Amino acid sequence: MLAFRKARRKLRMGTICSPNPSGTKTASEVCNADWMASLPAHLHNVPLSNLAIPGSHDSFSYWVDEKSPVGPDQTQAVIRLARISLVKKLMKKWSVTQNLTFREQLEAGIRYFDLRVSSKPGDTDQEIYFIHGLFGIKVWDGLMEIDAFLTQHPQEIIFLDFNHFYAMDESHHKCLVLRIQEAFGNKLCPACSVESMTLRSLWEKKYQVLIFYHCPFYKQYPFLWPGKKIPAPWANTTSVQKLILFLETTLSERAPRGAFHVSQAILTPRVKTIARGLVGGLKNTLVHRNLPAILDWVKTQKPGAMGVNIITSDFVDLIDFATTVIELNDLLEDRALTKC
């Protein structure tokens, strides 16, 4: 029965976003653009905090500018070292954690975005940029790309988690929040009870965007959710075994109500990791060989009040990450049918 439902769900949402001459589907070509709209009706009333939702780590880092100044998120030692042009090229290999653009991630099924932002030295127009060691695209450009997708897919809901701010004073925050408001308008969902956030309740009000803002500035705007409503425990390890143990432990400690929960299924390089794999970069040195084990862990999980909710990964296109997370929701379907 479960196999039949999975096949049916793939017919509904597993279409191809772009043709592949070989006839096979890579992870980046499987299109889950409308997976939320395609969930069975009884899941429309399940709180989003109880669904399995795929997300990406450092979601914006598919492009970073090696010609820009080093970001204020780096130490003074790194900033001084980066005066050597080769250093920035190497930094780029370790700053990029995604291959897909926002649009491509959305089409692949990603619905949670991990965002770090900063002002840029020398800019006088208060423009805000994404940042991960090096500066990425303008936040405004990213927001517009996301909004264009949402307009075309009115039943898809996204989480934008602004969790790190660098070199930003109150005027920068005001500028950023006004940009968010201008980009999404009536799609913005006001902060309220987490348990009341279901697909049906959001669809009825035409809300599509939940903004989490890890800064006291959130109190000034009703559509900014406090960061404490979406905890994302960080393992900070290069060991996949330690990562999985950490994920299991933090899930067991998850609050059953009042917050979403992010399981960061990511490995973090240490200085010696970078030194050993300097030229290879993050993807080739640490991520690629460990992703299969991480995906195997994901496959063993169940969503629900005490189960997984949002799961994030680096390089979400390298494996069938998003589809694997989405299909965990079939387990909620199983439970519902068992009770009938």
Curated annotation (Swiss-Prot):
Q: Which organism is it from?
A: Mus musculus (Mouse)
Query: What is the gene name?
Result: Plcxd2
Gene Ontology biological-process annotations: lipid catabolic process; signal transduction
- Active site positions, chain numbering: H57, H132
Which tissues is this protein detected in according to the database? Expressed at highest levels in brain, followed by stomach and small intestine. Detected at low levels in kidney, ey, thymus and slkeletal muscle.
| Protein origin, superkingdom | Eukaryota
The protein here is known as PI-PLC X domain-containing protein 2
| A GO molecular-function annotation | phosphoric diester hydrolase activity
Q: Name one GO cellular component term.
A: nucleus
Q: What's the stated role of this polypeptide? A: Catalyzes the hydrolysis of inositol from phosphatidylinositol (1,2-diacyl-sn-glycero-3-phospho-(1D-myo-inositol), PI). Could also hydrolyze various multi-phosphorylated derivatives of PI, such as phosphatidylinositol-4,5 bisphosphate (PIP2), releasing inositol-1,4,5-trisphosphate (IP3) and the protein kinase C activator diacylglycerol (DAG), therefore mediating cell signaling.
Which reactions are catalysed by this chain? Answer: a 1,2-diacyl-sn-glycero-3-phospho-(1D-myo-inositol) + H2O = 1D-myo-inositol 1-phosphate + a 1,2-diacyl-sn-glycerol + H(+)
The protein's location, in the record's own words, is:
Nucleus
Residues of the PI-PLC X-box domain: 42-215
Which keywords are on file for this protein? Answer: Hydrolase, Lipid degradation, Lipid metabolism, Nucleus, Transducer
What InterPro entries does its record include?
A: PI-PLC_domain, PLC-like_Pdiesterase_TIM-brl, PLCXD1/2/3, PLipase_C_PInositol-sp_X_dom
